[in-house]
Amino acid sequence: MLTERQLLIFRAIIDHFTWTIQPVGSKNLLKEKGLPYSSATIRNEMGVLEEYGFIEKTHSSSGRVPSEKGYRFYVDYLLQLKKLDKSDRQMIRSFFSENYYEMEGLIQNSALMLSDLTNYTSILLGPEATKNHLSGFRFVPINNFQAMLILITDQGHVDNHLVTIPEGTTLSDIERMVNILNERLVGLSLDDLKVQIPMEVKELLGKHVRNYESFMHVFSDSFAQASQQKVYFGGKTNILNQPEFHDINKVREMLHLMEEEQDVYELFRDIPDGLQVKIGRENNNSLMEDCSIITATYNIAGERVGGIVLLGPTRMEYNRMMGLVDVMSRDLTDVLTKLYRDNQN
């Protein structure tokens, strides 16, 4: 579709805008990139690229910038993923070589590391909570009036609730209650438990635990919270530091979105397998018209459990950013699978 000369000029325009965020004309492009063509030739070829819709003129300058269509063409047909440079690879290798014993901490720290490497906003979607099954209860008395209710799932999620011990309830009552719950509820899905605790369990509690009804709302709240989808952010406001976000209303709306974790989960829950890129208006979200989103998924023991989202400007350095997300997907899968298998033993 494009000649070698047009491709070379197009790549030069993309490279210029990635690093300067400024439109470029033929004279500056020649001076900056040292292209083996005259300014007039470059100007003519830029005219062809504009006719194809790959570059466009801005209102404030006579120079040209890449268009969404141009970036799409670049990512689909011109981009070749390269190996990460030594510093990126060393940082990732060092991170994943540490010993991790808890899944949530690993996923959260992965989000933070990705944002540190990119200076963009990273979002990791946790394993689907409704598939989690209860693996245990713990009740830790703090004093005569309060205790910590700890709920643990088979996916490594830990949910803590500070609860008030009903008057007249003894530590023996609490111990019997925890034993009954662990004996009867372990292995059941949170999706079922958040709807209703089995009647047989309530009957057992009624026989052996005084004032057990006072604890029922605590259990219901705990199951409901644990069954919510988990979203982990890194550099939540990094995207707002980009020059593209100068509209205060858009900044306010984006901050509001980032605070609504369940909305963020719904926005990205159906990301496809493999490394994917959506550019600008392809995101079907007015807040993200100036953004590109790179996504991938991660697995545990061969089963897809979560997603990785990198949110940055359309002028991002696609080669490096896609490489980072790809390596993150693979390495996180390996470490989570190892952690899962270690916990099964």
Curated annotation (Swiss-Prot):
<dbReference type="InterPro" id="IPR002571">
    <property type="entry name" value="HrcA"/>
</dbReference>
<keyword id="KW-0346">Stress response</keyword>
<dbReference type="Pfam" id="PF01628">
    <property type="entry name" value="HrcA"/>
</dbReference>
<keyword id="KW-0805">Transcription regulation</keyword>
<protein>
    <recommendedName>
        <fullName>Heat-inducible transcription repressor HrcA</fullName>
    </recommendedName>
</protein>
<comment type="similarity">
    <text>Belongs to the HrcA family.</text>
</comment>
<dbReference type="InterPro" id="IPR029016">
    <property type="entry name" value="GAF-like_dom_sf"/>
</dbReference>
<dbReference type="InterPro" id="IPR036390">
    <property type="entry name" value="WH_DNA-bd_sf"/>
</dbReference>
<dbReference type="InterPro" id="IPR021153">
    <property type="entry name" value="HrcA_C"/>
</dbReference>
<dbReference type="InterPro" id="IPR036388">
    <property type="entry name" value="WH-like_DNA-bd_sf"/>
</dbReference>
<comment type="function">
    <text>Negative regulator of class I heat shock genes (grpE-dnaK-dnaJ and groELS operons). Prevents heat-shock induction of these operons.</text>
</comment>
<keyword id="KW-0804">Transcription</keyword>
<keyword id="KW-0678">Repressor</keyword>
<dbReference type="GO" id="GO:0003677">
    <property type="term" value="F:DNA binding"/>
</dbReference>
<dbReference type="InterPro" id="IPR023120">
    <property type="entry name" value="WHTH_transcript_rep_HrcA_IDD"/>
</dbReference>
<dbReference type="GO" id="GO:0045892">
    <property type="term" value="P:negative regulation of DNA-templated transcription"/>
</dbReference>
